[in-house]
């Protein structure tokens, strides 16, 4: 069966976002990443700026802070409301047509669909570090810190909301090392596997 929806989860610095965008161009399908923030904000009633800062990375302050966080009348925290709005937007996008969606626990949210190709992009530390240094104009120490912090927040969010382990191979159809394969080959593999 052809896979009309491609989800891409990735380690920070692995080039997963770039690879996803190129795959969407090659297939001539929609690409969703940060461009869905306004839809999530609208569904949650929160500002796009708040969503930008928190949607994929909450509960960023840890489980104790999450447990002590304020809740609405239904018992949902702000993080839960953001996640629920994000889930609804992703389900709507999947119904609209073929697309590539980056991050946001999309592999888990769409797990019951047969037409989804779930991809995890990872890379080797030296290559990821150099990419972050180039893209963000930071030194090596800051690049390593950014990588560790971002991946930890992605992992915490994913593990919390999915009850699964972020980056675990069995959660994905494909796991690709962009450092060893290169971006172009990763793109070609994903395109081929989507057919």
Question: Language-model segments: which ranges?
Answer:
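ATP-dependent small-molecule kinase phosphotransfer cores
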Residues: 41-98
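Short, amphipathic alpha-helical "lid/cap" segments that border enzyme active or binding sites
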Residues: 87, 183-191
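Glycine-rich phosphate-binding P-loop
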Residues: 8-21
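Conserved phosphate-donor/acceptor-positioning beta-strand/loop module used by diverse small-molecule
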Residues: 112-134, 140-148
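Short beta-strand-centered segment that lines the nucleotide-binding/catalytic pocket of NTP-utilizing
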Residues: 30-41
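RNA pseudouridine synthases
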Residues: 93, 106-112
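Pre-Walker A (Motif I) flank of P-loop NTPase domains
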Residues: 2-11, 97
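Small-molecule kinase domains that catalyze NTP-dependent phosphoryl transfer to phosphate-bearing small molecules
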Residues: 59-66, 139-184
